[in-house]
Amino acid sequence: MKRLLLVLCYITLLAGCQKVVVEQEKTTPPLKPTQLIVGTLYGPQIYFTSGQGDSGYDYEMAERFANYLDLELKMKPFANISELYSAMHSGEIDIIAAGLADTPARREQFRLGPPLYRVNQVLVYRQGTPIPRSVDTLKGEITVTTDSSFVDTLTELQKSNPDLVWNQEKDKDAEELLTMIAAGEIPYTIADSTSLDINRRFMPELREGLVLKRKQPVVWLLPPTNSDKLMSELLSFWHIEKRSGTLAHLNEKYFAHVERFDYVDTRAFIRAIDNKLPKYQATFEKYAEGIDWRKLAATAYQESHWNPNARSPTGVRGLMMLTLPTAKQVGIKNRLDPYQSIKGGAKYLNSMLERLPDSIPESQRMWFALASYNIGLGHVEDARKLAQSQGLNPSAWRDVKSVLPLLQKRKYYQKTRYGYARGNEAVHYVDSIRRYYDTLVWIDNQNMLLELKQKPLQTAEAKETEEKPQTDAIQPQQP
């Protein structure tokens, strides 16, 4: 009997323990995530990787959002928009940040975040292709990416143009279609205006045609359900970034300097990369001293078009167009020696960087330094004070850039310490260097991708050579 009671007590205890475990499982809160997983697409203005690290508008915003949430950022690139959608619906990613526009179709599938920037949808064709006067004349000649906002636009246009048809590419992104346009493989596509502006630096043959949709918001996509907290956090973050000027800064950083396009200049620069840059690249890399060598090379191209014998009526000479006093200051004896010129230019540019106030953030210091290289640090400091007097941020390049042209107007320059300066030229100077730099980065990335593609082929060829029987070996002579 006692034994039976002991067994019953033991069973009761086990049942009680099981009950506690079940109750604990019910009340234990879900584990807090440690990562923000962001689905994206590769693209110059979206997300790309290089020897200098990760970059892109959406990447920078995602990095800031992850920091705001105190989470580790994980960028997860996909091959196309369809795969992005599938990953979101399966719960593989938390958010889509891929330069996608706000459309009715996307509103039906996802929750849309606040607008980051706005774009026009434009018809794109190659120089020499007949200029399209209306979309309805291009039956079957337009190619767009599957699931893109351009499909929605064409579907809408089809209601008033029933004969309008187009081709869709599932396995090619918008940039690949622009490449096909430049190569003459397809006649027409549709692109966002920002994407076209950026890609024309690398493919100057691209031309802008009809504007099909104006000022379309670019947004992030969130899951349609169970995303209330994430949406609330995103809205709070967006308001902070907008008030602080971060959104405006990123828009200026990625888009403002590419709006000015010069076909002849772009073609000449791409030719110079092939014909002239190889002579001096190692020297740029050697003397960059902490500066990205491509920024130094871009500066030299803006100064002299990489001509070591360049001269100007004002007395500046050489590849980096140094004045005589500047050459003496940096210890250069022969300004027409390209290697001395690069060394001196790098030293002078670094000195401009060092003399800038600490209040200027690292990401913008180079633009201030380049403006100082062009018109002098004193004039740039005048522009900073002028910006501050107008309620602008003297340490934000976008704000100082907006007031630099005022240094040419008597109303403003007579109140400054250093007087008149051609501020509009400094703005153009910096914007041009930024465009040249972006082109060099893009070409570097393309070369890196090409090398990665070639490695498996080279490995396979080497393995095949090793396994091949040596039929051509020298045979010993017969006696």
From Swiss-Prot:
The active site of this protein is located at E303
Please provide, alphabetically and separated by semicolons, the GO molecular function terms listed in this UniProt record.
peptidoglycan lytic transglycosylase activity
Which region is the signal sequence? 1-15
Biased amino acid composition, Basic and acidic residues: 461-470
- Enzymatic reactions: Exolytic cleavage of the (1->4)-beta-glycosidic linkage between N-acetylmuramic acid (MurNAc) and N-acetylglucosamine (GlcNAc) residues in peptidoglycan, from either the reducing or the non-reducing ends of the peptidoglycan chains, with concomitant formation of a 1,6-anhydrobond in the MurNAc residue
Q: Which UniProt keywords apply?
A: Cell outer membrane, Cell wall biogenesis/degradation, Lyase, Membrane, Signal
Q: Which PROSITE patterns match?
A: PROKAR_LIPOPROTEIN
The record's subcellular location field reads: Cell outer membrane
| Region named LT domain | 260-479
Non-LT domain: annotated span = 16-258
What is the uppermost EC class here?
A: lyase
UniProt GO BP:
cell wall macromolecule catabolic process; cell wall organization; peptidoglycan catabolic process
Give the membrane topology, semicolon-separated if more than one.
Peripheral membrane protein
Tell what the record comments on domains: The N-terminal domain does not have lytic activity and probably modulates enzymatic activity. The C-terminal domain is the catalytic active domain.
State the similarity comment: In the N-terminal section; belongs to the bacterial solute-binding protein 3 family.
What role is this protein assigned? Murein-degrading enzyme that degrades murein glycan strands and insoluble, high-molecular weight murein sacculi, with the concomitant formation of a 1,6-anhydromuramoyl product. Lytic transglycosylases (LTs) play an integral role in the metabolism of the peptidoglycan (PG) sacculus. Their lytic action creates space within the PG sacculus to allow for its expansion as well as for the insertion of various structures such as secretion systems and flagella.
Against PANTHER family, the record matches this protein to: MEMBRANE-BOUND LYTIC MUREIN TRANSGLYCOSYLASE F
Can you name this protein?
Membrane-bound lytic murein transglycosylase F
Q: Name the species this protein comes from.
A: Shewanella pealeana (strain ATCC 700345 / ANG-SQ1)
Lineage of source species: Bacteria, Pseudomonadati, Pseudomonadota, Gammaproteobacteria, Alteromonadales
